[in-house]
Amino acid sequence: MANWSCQDALKMYNVPYWGAGFFNIDALGRVVVTPDKTRLDCKIALVDIIEQLRKQGYATPVLLRFPDIIKTRINALFGAFEQAIQSYGYKGRYQCVYPIKVNQQNQVIESVTRAFADKPALGLEAGSKPELLAVLSHHHDLGSVIVCNGYKDREYVRHALLGSLLGHHVYIVVEKPSELELILDEAARLNITPRIGVRARLASQGSGKWQASGGEKSKFGLNAAQILRLVERLREADKLDCLQLVHFHLGSQIANIRDIQGGIRECGRFYAELRHLGANIEVVDVGGGLGVDYEGSRSQSHCSANYNLREYANNVVWGIGDVCAEFDLPHPMIISESGRAITAHHAVLISNIVGMESQLPTSLPDAPDAEAPMLLQNMWDSWKELHEKEDPGLLEIFHDSVSDLADVHTQYTLGMLSLHQRAWAEDLHLNLCLKLKVMLDPVNRMHRNLQDELNEKLADKCFVNFSLFQSLPDAWGIDQIFPIMPLSGLDQQPTRRGVIMDITCDSDGMIKEYVDGVGIENSLPMPEMRNDETNYMGFFLVGAYQEILGDLHNLFGDTHSAEVCLNDNGEPVITNIIKGDNVDNLLRYVNIDTSVIRRDYQKLVAHPSLSEETRKALLEELEAGLQGYAYLEDE
């Protein structure tokens, strides 16, 4: 393409659609972030931040957090609901609750609580005893909302009730029938009036990777008959007024707004029926599900969403309000647990490219001699047809070449062809694929599948200094798509494509799908790598679930992390730098005693053939290894 510009790069990587206004490309071809949308002129080049961290001794990979993005997302969510409430004349208020399971890192929870400072009240959700204790410690404002989900034992219930004594509005949501007796027993023992919620198991179900969270066979919630028994038990105990919240959850990352509409309507009916049964329901908790458009396609794909914040809020507010109008009921407070939508955009993983392995042929093999096997002659004939025929059948030529190459491999295994002949055939096939790729017409639908196949086949292997299993576990576990792109050189037209490999010893350690301007591709367009500088790759929208789900495959642990904030002058300030795991820590995680390792080193270097100077140098080197970063480091 002539006159390549950064606008072309934005389109190629689909940045305007998945970036949500936070990410852009500057005139120098660098990826920049605008974390605070009230200060659009404050743009931060990601490579500049990484270079500053390197000077301070922090090598990549590094996870960068932008707290201002969390604040911006919370403001946008509140704004969408406030506008919907005003538009529909809704009399209740909206309460955003952050479920900390999405990202329990202390810096993230602190960023969320700071962002709530000017909001009506802070809301946090816990799904386990450890999460509840963390949530209680982060609440400083009286009247803050705490939602207690998940399976519960007596201790969990007791801690939740004690939260009420601290002045918080703690809703203990009954997920299974047996939990109600625990709540009633502990509340009576502590002489505390509980706020009880019930999770309704809806027939409505979302679609996608997380659809099992909803529907009649979901792991959580009470069915209609169980809810009726719960109401009768509370009435019998004279505690029906304690039932104040009804909750449902269709699943995380709901892509289709119609699924949300159906769930809201069904939950609204539960609200209406419970009110008519005498329950003092004041809150409808619509759970999570608010999607993030990871691929920027605004579609029903499982990594996208065919709606925005405003449409989501409109459907929730209108749907509940419509049920209230139909049955002449008061408008309840609305809670949403939109953790993914709050945190996904705020974190970017950045690491260096450590190697490129080209799959392109370096030269064209010579024509086979007259005595060469017929199979090799046939392959050469396909090559000549591609060049000499006026209108060659491109698909047929490719299929013939693939078939011939398969026969070459078979005959080589049987000893009928030599290693030189196999290498000749493979080189010729690669040359043919490269020529075909140039000749294919991307507008021709018949050519598109082959174009994709050739892009993948001819793509470079791009080795990046990170662990997929530690930093992007959902890309491996559930094939989630994350936007990925080089952080510089984007003012140049991409000349090649790459497939990203991590540095684990696992063939699954590779990214299989990439966001592209025309859809999802199996390789990533890349500019030429510069040999005179470090080339960085950015992995975007990794702020939800990835850190806590990451594992220690090959003993690659947590990366360095840092927060980047804007000061009053609009300049970036790097704060809260946390060192990633060193080797010593990682060995201890798997119960390897590093003191024993050090003692064994002492024994090994005590060999009489080693001088005292050599022994000292060896021990220093081994100790440096134990204290070093688990990832690849520049000397």
UniProtKB/Swiss-Prot annotation:
It is an enzyme of class 4 (lyase). It comes from the Bacteria. One of its GO terms (biological process) is putrescine biosynthetic process from arginine. One of its GO terms (molecular function) is arginine decarboxylase activity. Keywords: Decarboxylase, Lyase, Magnesium, Metal-binding, Polyamine biosynthesis, Pyridoxal phosphate, Spermidine biosynthesis. Pfam families: Arg_decarb_HB, Arg_decarbox_C, Orn_Arg_deC_N. PROSITE patterns: ODR_DC_2_2. Substrate binds at V284, D285, V286, G287, G288, G289, L290, G291, V292, D293, Y294. Its cofactor is Mg(2+); pyridoxal 5'-phosphate. The modification N6-(pyridoxal phosphate)lysine is found at K101. Its EC number is 4.1.1.19. It catalyses: L-arginine + H(+) = agmatine + CO2. InterPro entries: Ala_racemase/Decarboxylase_C, Arg_decarb_HB, Arg_decarbox_C, Arg_decrbxlase, De-COase2_CS, De-COase2_N, Orn/DAP/Arg_de-COase, PLP-binding_barrel. Pathway: Amine and polyamine biosynthesis; agmatine biosynthesis; agmatine from L-arginine: step 1/1. SUPFAM superfamilies: Alanine racemase C-terminal domain-like, PLP-binding barrel. Belongs to the Orn/Lys/Arg decarboxylase class-II family. SpeA subfamily. HAMAP family: SpeA. Catalyzes the biosynthesis of agmatine from arginine. This is Biosynthetic arginine decarboxylase. It comes from Tolumonas auensis (strain DSM 9187 / NBRC 110442 / TA 4).
